A protein has these predicted regions:
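N-terminal secretory targeting modules
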Residues: 1-227, 237-240, 258, 431-436
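Conserved SGNH/GDSL esterase-like catalytic core that processes O-acyl groups on lipids
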Residues: 58, 79-80, 103, 109-112, ...
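Catalytic His-Asp segment of secreted/periplasmic serine-dependent ester chemistry enzymes
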Residues: 282, 314-316, 351-436
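A cross-domain feature marking catalytic cores of carbohydrate-active enzymes
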Residues: 310, 349-350
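Surface-exposed amphipathic alpha-helices with a cationic face
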Residues: 331-339
Length: 436
């Protein structure tokens, strides 16, 4: 073989390697699932076309193991009702067995549009059977999650979806999100593809197993993921009305001129703290922000910008953190995690809680010290001043009466709207390291 022939042979082999590598890696995405939409699905509808990208349209963190569910919900169908922030031409879901002690076996999973808000009835012609790696059955080990294959479904923005799962055997404690502020449903037996909703006679205030819904879209540029506590969780928002502050933010991003076309993903857990993990079975704590940042925020599909709304529980919940610098150091660490993924971080000031049963003047001083550092511009890339937006001008330690839900800690629906309106949407664009 001559030298020129040898070079030609090597070039040909290199081209083959490139082609084979391309064939292997197309359709296999990283944890954020950016390429999964190109894979084939054996569900009721074909996977969406390849032009577009995956973006999360809804999310809810796994909070704890649901009490009194030692055997799970075997031989029962769970129909979760969730609300989209943006639409798309295809969809996929993520199920979590984070707090399970046994494998979770799901033999039937479906996705449909709801015929009416908060209703278990599926809209005509929208029921889709879901598969996982081309199988109708998925087994999720304890502590793990599974993302379904893509199905073609025209998903509208600001619409309710029905995600139904059936498990035939005991699975151990159920991974759940307790403060959904949304009615979901349970039925006896395998009713996952039942469209009328009549079998779903048991109502539930929880989301179970389901932690994310993504859509395939070419109209949405990315996602804003919010890491927060009960204020972001919307624990005092009107049930079934989608009036959390993140819902109002999603509405602004959809409708306002020149707004970035982002979805909004809610990563709020009631009682959540920056520094301290909560107990396994507590519905009011969850893993700390530092512990769950990667799982609940950074790994969501299409995230471009992170908004952080937390820190107050570190001050008012035992063990109370008396050193504001410790809280700020934790917030800075959250920023570092996001910057490692080239994500921008907008941070919120800590809101007033005067009049709440946990209020003490010395604790409010700590809150103000944290806020001073946040406002200095040396913690986050940008700041949204939730404190200024919600406080009573006559008594800045308290919420404005029109924005107070009544417990003097959590906002009302009007307060949640004021939070969303306080955020300058231009701050959500781009990325830049925080100054130190």
């Amino acid at each position: 073989v001559t030298r020129n022939m040898g070079y030609a042979l090597l070039a040909g082999l290199a081209a083959i390697v490139v082609l084979v590598s391309t064939a292997v890696f197309i359709g296999v995405g990283s944890e954020d699932g950016s390429l999964d939409g190109l894979t084939q699905s054996t569900g009721d509808s074909a996977a969406p076309a390849s032009s577009g990208n995956w973006v999360g349209t809804w999310s809810a963190p796994a909070v704890a193991a649901e009490p009194n569910t030692r055997d799970g919900y075997h031989r029962m169908s769970i129909r979760n009702v969730v609300h989209t922030s943006v639409g798309g031409s295809g969809a996929r879901i993520t199920l979590s067995n984070l707090y399970g002690t046994k494998p979770l076996v799901v033999t039937h999973a479906t996705l449909a549009l709801a015929a009416a808000p908060s209703n278990p009835t599926a809209a005509t012609g929208t029921m889709r059977r879901l598969t996982f790696n081309n199988s109708r059955t998925v087994t999720i080990p304890p502590g793990r999650k599974a993302t379904s294959d893509a199905v073609r479904l025209n998903v509208p923005h600001a619409a309710d979806l029905l995600v139904t799962t059936y498990s035939p055997r005991p699975s151990g404690p159920v991974t759940y999100h307790p403060y959904a502020r949304q009615t979901s449903y349970v039925a006896q037996g395998d009713k996952a593809d039942e469209t009328s909703g009549t079998a779903f006679t048991q109502q539930s205030p929880y989301w179970r197993y389901l932690t994310a819904v993504d859509v395939w879209t070419h109209q949405t540029q990315g996602a804003v993921a919010v890491l927060g506590d009960s204020i972001t969780d919307g624990i005092t928002s009107s049930p079934g009305a989608n009036r959390r502050w993140t819902d109002f933010l999603a509405e602004r991003l959809r409708t306002e001129r020149n707004a970035p076309r982002y979805s909004v993903l809610n990563g709020g857990i009631s009682g959540n703290r920056v520094l301290v993990d909560g107990p396994r079975y507590s519905p009011n704590n969850g893993p700390s922000g530092l512990t769950r940042m990667q799982r609940d925020v950074l790994s969501r599909a299409g995230v471009r910008t992170v908004v952080v709304e937390m820190g107050l529980n570190d001050i008012i919940k035992p063990p109370r953190q008396n050193n504001p610098d410790r809280i700020v150091d934790g917030l800075r660490q959250l920023v570092k995690y996001a910057h490692a993924r080239n994500m921008r971080v907008v941070g919120g000031t800590l809101t007033p809680f005067g009049g709440h049963r946990g209020y003490e003047r010395r604790l409010d001083v700590i809150r103000q010290r944290v806020n001073e550092q946040i406002r200095s511009g040396k913690v986050y890339d940008s700041v949204v001043d939730f404190d200024a937006a919600l406080r009573d001008p006559a008594d800045p330690s308290r919420l404005r009466p029109a924005y107070d839900s009544g417990d003097h800690l959590h906002p009302s629906d009007n307060g949640f709207r004021a939070m969303a309106e306080a955020l300058d949407l231009k701050l959500l664009k781009g990325s830049s390291p925080a100054r130190t």
